[in-house]
Every structure is written in structure tokens, then in C-alpha cells.
Regions:
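Conserved class I S-adenosyl-L-methionine
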Residues: 1-34, 48-52, 70-73, 131-158, ...
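Short catalytic micro-motifs in class I SAM-dependent methyltransferases
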Residues: 105-106
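A short glycine-rich, Lys/Arg-flanked "PGG" loop and its adjoining helix->strand segment in the class I
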Residues: 114-126
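Short alpha-helix
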Residues: 159-174
Length: 243
């Protein structure tokens, strides 16, 4: 798989990415986040979800992200965020710091998920919640418009994403209990191809130029006939540090 430079992608992420519909509400409700909570997002990128949690609850929000350009874009949010350089497997916070540790569309970049989960477990308060938002095989196969117009992304994503049962197994090995899965789903009307033309999804950088060009041409042709019903699905995988 071709390596991606997320410093180069930061501008497009900031331009096109928004919090997933329904996800922040689910996070706040499931984890019971309040203004008294301390929340960590690992691999926060441009921090859209972290900023939304802060905006919704007033919680203290810390984001860890290795890309300097991603952190620069994240700092543009009006919400007060504590942004730090770092990697998932190298989390080094005092024991029992956080009420919630979360990551969104990040776990497939982590080479040693168990090590990350162990570090996150230690950083959580007893009773604290852990969340990783990822994609299931089914969701990857049924992404619209992605899988329809850029089918080469399916195998690319299968090569990147860990199977959800394997992640759940590692969470259990790390000590987490109360494991829980929830698919967050929404549909919307896609009116233009801009975010796909700009390759604001990392998987589009990992397919061939001819496959990309053919997909864009087909997408534009269908959009010329009217908007396309698209979907957004994310699998929320939860665990909890026992009391």
C-alpha cells in the first residue's frame, strides 16, 4: 500500500470533512460526557469530532495527532482544544486521567492495536469509556458512492482495516469489559463530485490513476442527471475500564 503524507492531506480534510451525522450525539450519550469530563481523542486529525464534543458538552478536550499540518488545521476551530503531538501506541498520560478515550477512523493506521488499547486502558479512570470508530467489511462493500464508482477502493480498504472481531478480541485482552458495537448510519443527497475530485478520502490516493479517472467520469455523468442518494456508515466499538 502506498504511504500517505497526512501533512499534504490536511487542507483537503479541513475543507471537506465534517462530523459524522449522529456520531457525536451517540458518543456524548453513551459515555455520559459532561462539562466535568476529560476527553482524549487519539489521532484526532483536524479534530472535527473533538471540537463538536467540546462544543456540545464543554468537556475538557485533548487531542493527540502526529501530523503537524493536521494539528494546525485543528487549531482553527473556535473551541478550546489542547492539541499535542503523539502516536497511539506511545500514549503516556498519568494513570486514570480520562473519562473517555476515543478515536475516529484512525485504528487502521495503528500497527499494534493491542499496545494502543493497553495504553488507553491505563489512561482511563476506573469506569471510563473507550471508543474506536471504524468500518466493517459490510460497510466498506456498501459505501455509496465510493464502492459504486471506485470499486478498487474495496480491496484497498480490506488491506488496511482490521476485522472488527480482531479489534474486539484485543480490547478484551487489554482488560476492557462491556464491549458493545453500534452502526451509526445516515443518508444524504450528493449534488457534486468536488470532495471526490479533491481526493478528500485517503483511499482514493491508493487506487490507480485510470481507475480514479473512470470513477470520476461516471460520477459526474450520473450527477448531471440529478443528485445521488449516498450513505455514511461508521461502526462504533466500545469498551469500558472496570470500576
Amino acid at each position: 500500500v502506498t504511504a500517505l503524507d497526512y501533512d499534504d492531506l490536511a487542507t483537503e480534510y479541513a475543507k471537506h470533512r465534517r462530523p459524522y451525522p449522529g456520531l457525536v450525539e451517540h458518543i456524548v450519550e453513551r459515555a455520559g460526557v459532561t462539562s466535568d469530563s476529560t476527553v482524549l481523542e487519539v489521532g484526532c486529525g483536524t479534530a472535527n469530532h473533538l471540537a463538536a464534543v467540546r462544543r456540545t458538552t464543554g468537556a475538557r478536550c485533548i487531542g493527540v495527532e502526529p501530523s503537524a499540518e493536521m494539528r494546525k488545521q485543528a487549531a482553527e476551530h473556535p473551541e478550546e482544544l489542547d492539541l499535542r503531538e503523539g502516536f497511539a501506541e506511545e500514549l503516556d498520560f498519568p494513570e486514570g486521567t480520562f473519562d473517555l478515550v476515543m478515536s475516529v477512523d484512525m485504528i487502521h493506521y495503528v500497527r499494534e492495536p493491542l499496545r494502543y488499547f493497553q495504553r488507553a486502558f491505563a489512561a482511563l479512570k476506573p469506569g471510563g469509556h473507550f471508543l474506536t470508530v471504524t468500518d466493517s467489511d459490510w460497510a466498506i462493500r456498501n459505501r455509496i458512492p465510493m464502492a459504486r464508482y471506485f470499486p478498487a477502493t474495496i480491496e484497498v480498504e480490506f488491506a488496511r482495516y482490521q476485522p472488527v472481531p480482531a479489534l474486539a478480541g484485543d480490547l478484551a485482552l487489554a482488560g476492557f469489559t462491556d464491549l458493545y458495537e453500534r452502526m451509526i448510519e445516515s443518508t444524504y443527497l450528493l449534488h457534486e463530485a468536488t470532495k471526490f475530485e479533491d481526493k478528500s478520502h485517503s483511499c482514493l490516493h491508493l487506487i490507480g490513476d485510470e481507475e480514479f479517472a473512470a470513477g470520476i467520469a461516471a460520477l459526474r455523468a450520473d450527477l448531471a442527471k440529478g443528485p445521488i442518494e449516498a450513505n455514511q456508515r461508521s461502526l462504533a466499538l466500545w469498551g469500558r475500564r472496570p470500576l
